[in-house]
Amino acid sequence: MAYLTQLRPDIQALLLSAFYFKGRIMSIQHHNTPGQASVGLGLRREMLDEFCQQVPSAINFFEVAPENWMILGGKFGRQFKQLTEQHAFFCHGLSLSIGSPEPLDSHFVQNIKRFLDEHNIEVYSEHLSYCSGTGHMYDLMPIPFTDDAVIHTAKRIKQVEDILERPFILENVSFYAAPGAQMTEQEFVNAVLQEADCKLLLDVNNIYVNSINHQYDAAAYLAAMPTKRIAYLHIAGHYEEEADLMVDTHGADIIDPVWALLQQCYQIHGVHPTLLERDFNIPKTDILLNEINQIHQYQQNALTQQSILRKA
C-alpha cells in the first residue's frame, strides 16, 4: 500500500478504513457461511474447554440455543466469544413460542437480535410449535393443524423477521397428539412456509419419529417438503419406548432407518448443511466424530452421484 503515502492524510484514513471494513466483512462471511456439504454439532458447555483448544476439522459449524448463552458471563462467556469469533455458528431457539395465542414477546425477540448481532450470527431457526398460553410450559406443544393457525403463525413469523432483520427458519417438530387437526402435518408445514414465505429446518429424525407414532410413510413426507425452502438439516437419535412409540430425546446414537432417510433426503433435495444433535448421554468427541464423519461420507456420496447423473 505504498501508494497511499502519496495521498492526502484524510484520503489515506478513508481508504484504510475501507480496507479494514472489507477485511472484517470477508472474515465474518468466511466463518459464518459453511458450504452446502458441511456438518455441524450442537455446542454444549462441557465442550468449551476442549474446543477452545482445538476444533476437529470435521466440524464445520456449531449450533446453540441462544436462551442458554445470551446471559452467560465469566469464563464460559469468554470461551463462547472466542469460538464465535473463529467459527461458523447457527442459532436454534427454544422458547419463542411462534404459534402461541398470546401476543408475541417482542422484548425477547429484541434480546435475541442483540445476541445474534454481537456474535455475527445470521442463521436463526425455531420450532414450529408453541410453549406458552396463560403461562410458560416446559415443553414444545404442537400447533393445531388448521387454516386459522397457518395465518396466525405466518403473521407472527413476519413480525419476528422485521425485528431480527434476518430470515426466519422453522423446524418440523416431533409431536404425540394432534387435536383439532383439519389437515395433515405435512400439509400444515407446507402451508405455513408458503404463507410466511420462510425457510425450513428439516429435521430428519423428527420425520422418522412421527412416522412411527402416527403411522405414516416417512419417505412420502420427505418428498412432500419444498426443496427450495430447505435451509439446513437436523439429525439425531431417539428413544424407543414401545415398538410403536418413539420419543425424540437426542440422547442416543442414530439408527439405521434414520441414516437411510438422510440419504434419501440428499437424493431428493440435494445436499444441505446437516447438524448432529446430541443433548443427553453425550459421549466423548471421538465417538461423536464417528457420526459426523458418517454424515460427511453420505454427503460426498450424494454429490458424486449427482455429478454422475449430470454427465450422463
Report the location of each language-model feature.
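Short, Lys/Arg-enriched N-terminal segments with co-localized hydrophobic residues
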Residues: 11-25
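N-terminal pre-domain/capping segments
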Residues: 26-114
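Acidic-and-aromatic substrate-binding clefts and catalytic sites of carbohydrate-active enzymes
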Residues: 48-49, 66-76, 97-107, 177-182, ...
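Acidic (Asp/Glu)-rich catalytic clusters
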Residues: 53-56, 75-91, 107-122, 161-162, ...
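Conserved, mostly hydrophobic/aromatic
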Residues: 62, 124, 203, 233, ...
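Gly/Pro-rich active-site loop or hairpin
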Residues: 73, 103, 140-150, 211-269
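Active-site acidic/histidine proton-transfer and metal-coordination neighborhood
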Residues: 105-200
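Acidic/histidine-rich catalytic cores of soluble enzymes
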Residues: 161-245
